[in-house]
Amino acid sequence: MKIGKVIGSVWATRKAQCLQGQRFLVVDTGREDLVAADQVGAGIGDKVLLTTGTVASRYCMDAPIDAAVVAIVDENGGHR
């Protein structure tokens, strides 16, 4: 899992059927920017928890994704 900050969103006018209804966010992890499927209603500026890889795909009903926002972080003990 990774912690990051939502810095934008991605709008797709056409996408695969299995991605219909998914909202995508751009998340800065401090090392790279990732596009992640939003599962919790996060917004720009929110600190979020991401899951990546196969787990993200399984979390989203096996959609072809490799990152998903699974929590909005209120506090993380002062660590990035």
Task: Name what the model sees in each region.
Residues 1-26:
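N-terminal first-folded block
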Residues 49-80:
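C-terminal structural segments of small proteins and small subunits
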Residues 15, 38, 58-59:
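Short, flexible, glycine/charge-rich loop motifs used to bind or transfer phosphoryl groups or to couple energy/partner
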Residues 32-37:
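Short alpha-helix capping/helix-loop boundary micro-motifs
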Residues 27-28, 51:
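Short beta-strand-to-turn element immediately C-terminal to the catalytic PLP-Schiff-base lysine
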